[in-house]
Curated annotation (Swiss-Prot):
Localization of this protein: Cytoplasm
Gene: pfdA
Organism ancestry: Archaea, Methanobacteriati, Methanobacteriota, Stenosarchaea group, Methanomicrobia
Entry GO MF terms: unfolded protein binding
GO biological process, one term: protein folding
UniProtKB keywords: Chaperone, Cytoplasm
UniProt protein name: Prefoldin subunit alpha
Pfam families, A to Z: Prefoldin
Major localisation: cytoplasm
């Protein structure tokens, strides 16, 4: 029978905790990426709705934040131009159609990143499961 040391069990537990910690961190990052995807979707819907209203010759009424939870009512008279965040603190003016395309590309990139993160999370979970199986095997001889 193989002798199992307390150090072996501690090492196994430490490895399991590390996998668990990494998996939790990855889940938090995945939630942030998912929130960005949702934000892209919301921006796309809003731009398209504003384009429709503008094409009908109407103005859209909205509320603009002025700070500290305060808003003023404003009318959007021209939805043909959109300021799009390019990242790293830079923005650019684009047509509404270009902005929708930019958001579509960004969403595709974020979706790929989310898929990669999901694959990594699966590996962490499989690693934890393998360690749990190993721990069960180590405990069985001592119970017999």
């Amino acid at each position: 029978m193989v002798e199992v040391s307390e150090e072996d069990i501690r090492n196994l537990a430490a490895r399991h905790q590390e996998f668990q910690r990494q998996a939790e961190g990855l889940k938090q990052q995945m939630n942030m990426v998912q929130a960005s995807i949702t934000s892209c979707d919301q921006a796309t819907v809003t731009i398209n709705e504003l384009k429709t209203v503008s094409a009908e010759g109407k103005t859209a009424e909205t509320m603009v934040p002025v700070g500290f939870g305060s808003f003023v009512y404003a009318e959007i008279k021209n939805a043909d131009k959109v300021i799009v965040d390019l990242g790293a603190g830079f923005s650019a003016e684009e047509t509404a159609d270009e902005a929708v395309e930019t958001l579509k590309r960004r969403k595709e990139q974020l979706t790929k990143i989310l898929e990669q993160m999901s694959a990594s999370l699966t590996k962490y979970i499989q690693g934890m499961q393998a360690l749990e199986v190993e721990a069960e095997k180590l405990q069985q001889p001592s119970q017999a």
